[in-house]
Amino acid sequence: GHPLLYDVNHWMEDELFRVGTVDAIWRETQAGMDALLARYGMIRDGHLYRCENNQPDTIVLFCHFGIMMACIGHLLGVSPMLLWHGFCTQPSSVTTLVTEERVKGEVVFRCMQSGDLSHLYAADEPYSTAALFPECYTGRDSTDPPEWDALGYR
């Protein structure tokens, strides 16, 4: 096993990351999220954000699954490895985080929904399962229907 992967502070020290740029991308993602939130008055302090005048603003980000889970890991204080390997969100899905200020000036994030596809269901549109391996081994690396392969995506 790789027990370090579960540790929010030490997952990058695992042997899997001794080469490559994941460490640099992780630090850039953390800094970018903190800089964005600072523009809204939220200053990172450990695993929470200090905010003198929290507002009910909405911030919308469009990003790839990998970066999204890195951002969520940073905001929730969990190793992104758990999210990368334990969650699946399809293209065009919606994930919603909210802030809570239980103590005046202390803001934390909570995930309200992850990978919501209700807009596709409402329009009777199919969703991709390409991010998943089959539930039972088939020799294929995708769960998308075979006819999607011939058409590019769908």
Descriptions of predicted regions:
Residues H64:
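Short, conserved phosphate/pyrophosphate- and ester-handling motifs at nucleotide-, phospho-/glycolipid
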Residues G1-Y40:
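Phosphate-handling substructures
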